[in-house]
Amino acid sequence: MTSLDDTIISYQNIMLLDNMTNYNKPAIDYFHHEFNDASLEISASWTLLLKMRKHKLLRLPSCSSEDVLDYNMYLVRLHHCLWRRWSINHYGLQNSKSNPLSINWNKETDVTVLYGPDLTNIDSNENEISPVQNQIDQKQTKNLKSALKKNTECWVTEEVDEINASIESNDNALVKLEDISCPSSVDSHTSSIFDQHSTCTKISSIDEDSEDLMNEKKEQFPRKLKFNQAVMKREIDSKGTIRESLININDIQHSRHHRRHHRRHHHHHHQNSSHSDETIKEAHYEFSNYTFGTMEEDIFYRNQVVF
C-alpha cells in the first residue's frame, strides 16, 4: 500500500484519512492524555500506530512527512510511549513512577510533552454511530419481514389454487387413462404379474404436490396390459426381395400333439383351423400401414409361423 487510494474503504480508514487531511483536528499529548481503560483506547491506538509504521498515512504535528528519518523516529517514539503507559496500567505501576521534581531535566534535550494524532475517537465514534445504524437496520428488517410475510401468503394462496386445479385435471386424466390402459390377454392360460396390481405406464406428467393423490387413484383403478396377437417380420434376401410374415406371439393354449407335429402338418393345420387364420389376418391388417408394398397372399401364407 503506497497511497491512500490503495486503502480499503472502511470507517477506520476514513478516520485515518480525516486525520491526514483535516488540519483543524487537534493533537493530544501522549504523555499526559487520559486514555479510557474501559474502551481500551491505549491498545487500539498502539495497534494503529503499529500498522502505520510502514506507511506515511498519519499527520504528525512535530515533524514533516517528507523527512523519512524524522517521520519514522517520531512514530517510534509515539509507539514506545503508548507501550510504556499500557504496561504501567496493566501491571499497576502507577505508584512506582519517579518524582518529576527529583529529576535534573536538561531543557535542551529532554522533552516533557509528546504530541501525536488523536486515534482514540475512531472506535468511540463508531460505537456511537452503531446504535443508530442498528435501529435503522432493525426497522429495515421489520419492513422486510412484513413484506416477506405478505409475499409468502400470496404465494401459498397461488400454490393452493394451482394444486386444486392440478387435482381436477388429474381426475380428468384418470378418466382418459381408463381408455388408454388395455386389459391383459384373456387367452392367457397362466396368471401374469401385470394382471392384478400393475398400471398403465402412459401417464401424463403431473405436479409433485398431487403425486400422492394420483398413486391413491391408481390403486383404486388397477389396469391390465394388452399384447398384440402377432408381430410383423420382414426379411430381405440377397436379391432385394422383401418378404413379410406374421408371427403369432399370443400364448394360446395348444395340445401337446399339435405342438409336436406342428411343422409336419403345417398346411393341413391351416385348412382345419379357421380361427387361427382369422386371428393372423386381423393382425396382418393392423400392420398393413407399415408394409413396403403389396404382397401376394401365397407369400403371406408361405412365410407365416404359428406356434
From Swiss-Prot:
Residues 254-278 are annotated as: Disordered. It comes from the Eukaryota. One of its GO terms (biological process) is cellular response to glucose starvation. Residues 255-272 have a biased composition (Basic residues). One of its GO terms (cellular component) is nucleus. InterPro entries: Glucose_repression_reg. To yeast YOR062c. Present with 1960 molecules/cell in log phase SD medium. This is Uncharacterized protein YKR075C. The lineage of its organism: Eukaryota, Fungi, Dikarya, Ascomycota, Saccharomycotina.
